[in-house]
Amino acid sequence: MEEKVVDRRVRKTKRQLRLALMKLMAEKSVKDISVRELAAIADINRGTFYIHYKDVYDLLSSLEDVLADGLVVVCRRHNAKDSEGKTYPYLMELYQYIEQNADLCHVLLGKNGDIAFTDRICHILRDEFLYDFLAYYYPNDPAMLDYFCSFIVSGNMSLALTWIDGGMKQTAEEMAVLAGEIIMHGVKVLETKA
């Protein structure tokens, strides 16, 4: 029984620290955040912080792993061969995941996030679903496939961040449809919206 209480306290402390880091990263770069500042916002002492994390970067890494691992799960649920050439189910789940983790995405992938982490996310999106999907349905030119994958992944990252920064007025479903239309029809999407 006592162990559950400790586990709950540990979870609560870690949650407070994650929220404190997200709050601070919304305002400034992680390199400008001190353990003292984090502990004050999380309402814990510095010693408690060091029980759980080596430093601010260790805490940041744990947050990044949570987001990245969740994206891997989303991507792996969608097999290119079983998708019948349709990206909507994948995009739908991807944008739902982004919606559910909007604060985390905003902080980790936004202006104060780490570019290396953004690259990691791009590689996950590319390598865990998109490349196989495009190679299976459009196998003609591997070099063009690489360019197209890079374009789609970067575009979707930017689209998601623009959506988050704009207050997420559209639903995840609407964003998935928009992303799919842009991927499949490019600039023609603007012609139909005008």
Give the residues covered by each predicted segment.
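Basic, helix-initiating cap at the start of DNA-binding domains
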Residues: 1-28
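Residues in the helix-turn-helix
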Residues: 16, 48, 104
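Basic, amphipathic alpha-helical hairpins
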Residues: 23-30, 74, 78, 101, ...
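Helix-turn-helix
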Residues: 24-57
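Short, basic, alpha-helical segments at the C-terminal edge of helix-turn-helix-like DNA-binding modules
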Residues: 34-35, 63-72
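Hydrophobic alpha-helical connector segments
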Residues: 75-103
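Amphipathic alpha-helical packing segments from all-alpha helical-bundle domains
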Residues: 112-138, 146-150, 154, 158, ...
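C-terminal peripheral helix-coil segments that are non-catalytic and often amphipathic
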Residues: 134, 154, 162-194
